Structure formats: C-alpha cells, structure tokens
Amino acid sequence: FLSLIPHAINAVSALANHG
C-alpha cells in the first residue's frame, strides 16, 4: 500500500503539471 502512495502522487503531479 505504501508503495502505491508515491505512484499515485506522481500521477496526480504529472496531471497537474500538464494542466
């Protein structure tokens, strides 16, 4: 579970950066 957190944050960060 803890391993998924950074991955989810990275995905959200990528979307925010693209926006």
From Swiss-Prot:
<comment type="similarity">
    <text>Belongs to the frog skin active peptide (FSAP) family. Phylloseptin subfamily.</text>
</comment>
<feature type="modified residue" description="Glycine amide">
    <location>
        <position position="19"/>
    </location>
</feature>
<comment type="function">
    <text>Has antimicrobial activity.</text>
</comment>
<keyword id="KW-0878">Amphibian defense peptide</keyword>
<dbReference type="GO" id="GO:0006952">
    <property type="term" value="P:defense response"/>
</dbReference>
<keyword id="KW-0027">Amidation</keyword>
<dbReference type="GO" id="GO:0005576">
    <property type="term" value="C:extracellular region"/>
</dbReference>
<keyword id="KW-0964">Secreted</keyword>
<protein>
    <recommendedName>
        <fullName>Phyllospetin-H3</fullName>
    </recommendedName>
</protein>
<keyword id="KW-0929">Antimicrobial</keyword>
